[in-house]
Amino acid sequence: MASQGTKRSYEQMETGGERQNATEIRASVGRMVGGIGRFYIQMCTELKLSDQEGRLIQNSITIERMVLSAFDERRNRYLEEHPSAGKDPKKTGGPIYRRRDGKWVRELILYDKEEIRRIWRQANNGEDATAGLTHMMIWHSNLNDATYQRTRALVRTGMDPRMCSLMQGSTLPRRSGAAGAAIKGVGTMVMELIRMIKRGINDRNFWRGENGRRTRIAYERMCNILKGKFQTAAQKAMMDQVRESRNPGNAEIEDLIFLARSALILRGSVAHKSCLPACVYGPAVASGYDFEREGYSLVGIDPFRLLQNSQVFSLIRPKENPAHKSQLVWMACHSAAFEDLRVSSFIRGTRVIPRGQLSTRGVQIASNENVEAMDSTTLELRSRYWAIRTRSGGNTNQQRASAGQISVQPTFSVQRNLPFERVTIMAAFKGNTEGRTSDMRTEIIRMMESARPEDVSFQGRGVFELSDEKATNPIVPSFDMSNEGSYFFGDNAEEYDN
């Protein structure tokens, strides 16, 4: 990437810091996850949860959501100004599952947001620790990416369900900051921009007045984030056009959809981070592990190591397959929903199957489900190897735009060849090359046509043994090319409904 000099590393974004060296970054990321762990321990104490109840992923999610809600200032302000029946704007809560007489029971808890904020700050040396909050948002987003399909959202904005591999981070809240922007896929950014443009088309005051000025700044900022994800000059130039448009309308929507399609072959750079549930960090802190002193990284061996030694439970519905539930959570932990299944399977050491074949629904349990009929199971979150998380989109060389990997957005920096039928994708480009962006469109299509399926992504990069923490001996796996590796084939997952 040409602009590497001006970019901050994830960990800097993650911790809001200025330029830091590797040791400082590891320490500040360690401080962040340590704070989450301390907060979680304190909440388990407040709620008098047993060790097993504290390791239940459903309880973890409830507690994470409570603290995120307690710090959601915009929504809190909105709730206070528009009081709705039966909702106390000053309180937050959710379902906590407890073990009673050999059965699981659901208990709804309610806490003052002020109290939750106090506990959170206390666990984070008196600071607001926004980085830790963002970290939990990204974990929830990664879980949603692995659990739900976004076909409906894609179709609503005029995009094609085949673009689902571009939708990483599509459920992240807007307030997730730079660390959140880094992990959003090209499709997610395009969708946010299209929604904005559509509002502008329908509401003439959207771009006007003082509010409109702020809207415009947000629009341009989002355009710049998306531009930064593209790796070819022509794609970047088209983004400049979209950003500079006087009043954005259908022409811009067309351009954005074209760009999203082009990203299926000329992949954008999207960051990947292993964000784990709070119930993993908590017990580690409780056992005396000092994350800040030892240092921690979201993109190296640390999360794999932590999961090797963690025990996490999950409630399981009567007809669900515990192994499938484990796969879902494993993928979420490593942000691997869009990774090639061949690569994930190799790293995990057990076969990772497409979502259409999973006998499991989401991790969260709806309020109308009968918990007493449910059992709990230990999630198998260990791996056979570890690999470095990537932010490149899988392009072989940055000099000339080569093909990224189709229908997946690579998570792990591991050599693989590209199993794709370029014909199927190029078929989506029978579109027009007229209009003001014609030369750029022609250039992009030319690049896509010259992308060779036999190219290899991440040349020479491999996976590592879990004992090889310095990543000295890469093992380059060889993959069977006959089967395409997308998680979304034969998809029958539920839609994500907010």
Swiss-Prot record:
PTM summary: Late in virus-infected cells, may be cleaved from a 56-kDa protein to a 53-kDa protein by a cellular caspase. This cleavage might be a marker for the onset of apoptosis in infected cells or have a specific function in virus host interaction.
GO BP annotation list: symbiont entry into host cell; viral penetration into host nucleus
Motif position, Unconventional nuclear localization signal: 1-18
Listed Pfam families: Flu_NP
Motif (Bipartite nuclear localization signal): 198-216
Presence of keyword RNA-binding: yes
Family designation: Belongs to the influenza viruses nucleoprotein family.
Assembly and interaction partners: Homomultimerizes to form the nucleocapsid. May bind host exportin-1/XPO1. Binds to viral genomic RNA. Protein-RNA contacts are mediated by a combination of electrostatic interactions between positively charged residues and the phosphate backbone and planar interactions between aromatic side chains and bases.
Listed name of the protein: Nucleoprotein
Source organism of this protein record: Influenza A virus (strain A/Hong Kong/156/1997 H5N1 genotype Gs/Gd)
Gene designation: NP
